[in-house]
From Swiss-Prot:
Phylogenetic classification of the source organism: Eukaryota, Metazoa, Ecdysozoa, Arthropoda, Chelicerata
Pfam families given in the database record: Toxin_27
GO molecular function, one term: calcium channel inhibitor activity
The protein, known as: Hadrucalcin
Biological role: This toxin activates ryanodine receptors RyR1 and RyR2 by inducing a long-lasting subconductance state (35% of the full conductance stateon RyR1). Furthermore, it triggers calcium release from sarcoplasmic vesicles (11.8 nM are enough to induce a sharp release on RyR1, and 55% of the total calcium is released after toxin (100 nM) addition on RyR1) probably by acting as a cell-penetrating peptide (CPP). In addition, it has been shown to dose-dependently stimulate ryanodine binding to RyR1 (EC(50)=14.8 nM).
InterPro entries (UniProt xref): Scorpion_calcine
Annotated disulfide bonds: C44-C58, C51-C62, C57-C73
Signal peptide positions (record): 1-27
UniProt keyword list: Calcium channel impairing toxin, Disulfide bond, Ion channel impairing toxin, Knottin, Neurotoxin, Ryanodine-sensitive calcium-release channel impairing toxin, Secreted, Signal, Toxin
Record flagged with keyword Signal: yes
UniProt subcellular location: Secreted
Principal localisation: secreted
Amino acid sequence: MKTSSLTIIFIAVIITIICLNIHDIEAREIEFNAGRVVRSEKDCIKHLQRCRENKDCCSKKCSRRGTNPEKRCR
């Protein structure tokens, strides 16, 4: 009885550790992607940067281009 209880507790601890490690890896990926977004807003190429609502464009001029409804800086 004691051996099976210890085995169950051991398995539960291992599963908990694995789940916490997976969550930590996902959190690092989110932080990495957020850092990349911040860098891309700072280092923008004027003719490729898309205009977004309530945000300034790199070139400060925003107009529609082509048939796509998305707006781009000029």
